[in-house]
Amino acid sequence: MASTRARPMLPLLLVLVAVVIPGPVGAQVSIHPTEAFLPRGGSVQVNCSSSCEDENLGLGLETNWMKDELSSGHNWKLFKLSDIGEDSRPLCFENCGTTQSSASATITVYSFPERVELDPLPAWQQVGKNLILRCLVEGGAPRTQLSVVLLRGNETLSRQAVDGDPKEITFTVLASRGDHGANFSCFTELDLRPQGLSLFKNVSEVRQLRTFDLPTRVLKLDTPDLLEVGTQQKFLCSLEGLFPASEAQIYLEMGGQMLTLESTNSRDFVSATASVEVTEKLDRTLQLRCVLELADQTLEMEKTLRIYNFSAPILTLSQPEVSEGDQVTVKCEAHGGAQVVLLNSTSPRPPTSQGTSPRPPTSQIQFTLNASPEDHKRRFFCSAALEVDGKSLFKNQTLELHVLYGPHLDKKDCLGNWTWQEGSQQTLTCQPQGNPAPNLTCSRKADGVPLPIGMVKSVKREMNGTYKCRAFSSRGSITRDVHLTVLYHDQNTWVIIVGVLVLIIAGFVIVASIYTYYRQRKIRIYKLQKAQEEALKLKVQAPPP
């Protein structure tokens, strides 16, 4: 039979008729199945049957969907409903005589969501700010058995029922550093297990979040304000505490020109270092600019640099090496706008001309002196100052004067009178002064034996005597007598002392022995006398016979 599609209003009219007009006694219409669960666009066979025995029985099926009558009998008909798009209630009706009756079935349609989509995430999300996640669900039935889940990686953030079409669910996340690189997604769950089917999932596209953090927004630009021509300067720009440092871009510009640099990125630190040779070609004033880019943020720091040229002062000696008594001129000159502010020396002896007392700054200072031995290795110091951009800069120069003079052998150089104990360890110091350094010889005047200069491990009495020391160099010579006295004790004296001590001790022993002998003898005599006296008393007291 040809497929037909019922008119929309007819089922409603039939229901009303069935309610208002009761059927004949015993007549009943039935529909099978009374409930059906099928996918959207599916088909189902519906059987309408009646208990009416009237030969003119009219039996039919009303539905919104395409139907085909597959077969029929006197009181039944079998239909096929196709392309069912949504939940519906097909109606079997009968005309039995002058009455009508009907029965309906429930068809529930299930379908998977047509669209499950997580809204695109921002290119960068700042740490500490709220991120709103949105998941859109279109389609899917039955809605009572449909839910949507938001995920961060494998962690469930939110689970909500889907009660509208389309349905948008949201969830707010406080972004953290740990969310950098995290994957976010959403999926739907259509639970058809109560109907004997499975749990079906539809997953959205996974989106990755990138977070950033800039707790400190001030770049650190480490560089001097003043740059001297002829020097190699290092510029350093850095920022600490940012995240992720590996994604940060940092660069340096000087005078609008990008500098070649070395950059360092660690866990939460980024830096850029550039080395620049300062030349005369550079402008006297330049802008140094550091730029850091992270996410959609840009940080900048600028510094004004001043270029200057400042050469060290020129310090000269009329002669760097002179003889004792010669006159020496010391001169210090500054150039390029610099001023000499100090010309001095390490020696406390003042110069013989023009002095070094404070004076107003000038481009040149000089003085003269008559060289003496005290001026040997005297260091002269010159300081020049240049004011640049309100700051005073200084450069210094030093020179050393060498004075040639003959040997000196004073008490401070060679004590000349030593008294040592025989057998002791001593150090004999005798060092003449002079330039060039003089040689020294010391020998005993009596026999020419040399004086032991330096470490003496054991002093001997044979070293005792007067020595003549001679210091000499190409500048002359000088002599001086020195004395070494060795204290010692004669062995014969010790023998006599020991003998006397032995005699004294022997005499003391003899006297003590004699004293002890006579004392014991006297005690014995005393005891004997006492015994005799006692015996006599006893004899006198005895009665006569």
Curated annotation (Swiss-Prot):
Residues 41-103, 128-193, 230-297, 325-389, 423-476 form the Ig-like C2-type domain. GO terms for cellular component: cell surface; external side of plasma membrane; extracellular exosome; extracellular space; immunological synapse; membrane raft; plasma membrane. Residues 343-365 are annotated as: Disordered. Residues 28-492 are extracellular. A motif (Cell attachment site) lies at residues 177-179. One of its GO terms (molecular function) is integrin binding. Glycans are attached at residues 47, 154, 183, 202, 309, 344, 396, 417, 439, 464. Belongs to the immunoglobulin superfamily. ICAM family. PANTHER family: INTERCELLULAR ADHESION MOLECULE (PTHR13771), INTERCELLULAR ADHESION MOLECULE 1 (PTHR13771:SF18). This is Intercellular adhesion molecule 1. It comes from Rattus norvegicus (Rat). The lineage of its organism: Eukaryota, Metazoa, Chordata, Craniata, Vertebrata.
